[in-house]
Amino acid sequence: RDLRLAIIEGDSLIDEILKEHGHPGQDMGERLKSIHPTEIDILNDLWEAHKIRNRLAHEADFHLSVEEAKKIIGIYHKTIEELLNIELELI
């Protein structure tokens, strides 16, 4: 449950950063489409993470393994570091 929440909150945080960086769109999906592939090294991974976040948020019976959840959190972590040009300590 905590990992599901971490994924949903991580996705929201990245969406807020994208808005602040001026990426247009009504939602995160539209903002992701506005990103040039050279802007984020792991853009495809971010897309996949966002799709899984949507399934977590909208499909009550969607199951995600702990390993997959940790992988997605790692993708969000790396994306935030890239977007903000900072190094974060993952706890």
Q: Where in the sequence are the language-model features?
A:
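Histidine-centered, metal-coordinating catalytic motifs and their short helical/loop contexts
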Residues: 39-63
